[in-house]
Amino acid sequence: MVSDSHATLVETNWNEEWKALQAARHPADDPAFWDSRARHFQARETHPYARAFMERAAVAPGESLLDMGCGAGSLAIPYGLRGNHVLACDFSPHMLDVLGEGIRFHHLEALVTPKLLAWDDDWDAAGMQPKSVDVAIASRSIATHDLAAALLKLDRTARRRCCITLIATGSPRVDRHIMDAIGVSVTESHDYVYAFNILVRLGRHPEVSYIISPRRDTFNTLDEGVADFARMLEGGNEERLPELRTYLAHHMVENPEAGMPGEKGRPQGAYMLDHVREVCWAFIAWKPQGLDEE
């Protein structure tokens, strides 16, 4: 006998559940937002998160990739340096400009090709051919109302493997340690669960592992820190700003690496918090459907 809970799990339309979740959320950041932040993202070295992603993706030498939502090239550049051909796509023109600087810096013009493309674009009209790359990846970049359509676009483009990461806990922009300390509840969305279940419904066999990404937030003054962390209070918790200021004042310490390049390439601030913020990402990989199976 099948339990009610099992039946509900199997019968749930997870893409419709995802759409409802997106409708209740703050609107996704648009290209203009990422354009404004592009200069803070410069791929000059391979960071621990990128190394962990690449280890799990297991892209073979000589294989071609689609890097969807590539940003400034945190993965496209390392893959290019390994000799892989990469089609690096993003919906932010300025991000692609910064990527172009990285391509020229590393002399990767023959290996990494930037392309302006959004998840919700018509990929056929944009020239994205079926089974045109060996591996399709989307690292921390799936921001779309229709998750199933996005996953199917990756599936249709890749011949051998698809790899994505989605948040496994709360928002990557929220420091749970701080929020707990100042009495603000945090809703953990577990975005990856939706993708996993959609893929299962599509007949794929997704595999899941986790990447713990430590983040060290730095700032130069208390006021700067408050302004930066205040983003976590948007959407109904703005009245907790005094508690946030008090917390930061008691937990800010000198940063021994002040002035050195941070994760996004810009100089680190003079102060940091006395704890490391950890973000958990779910890495999901699957074998795409072949053209003869469609």
What is each of the regions a protein language model found here?
Residues 167-186:
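Short, glycine-/aromatic-enriched active-site segment of Class I SAM-dependent methyltransferases
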Residues 79-122:
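Class I SAM-dependent methyltransferase SAM/SAH-binding core
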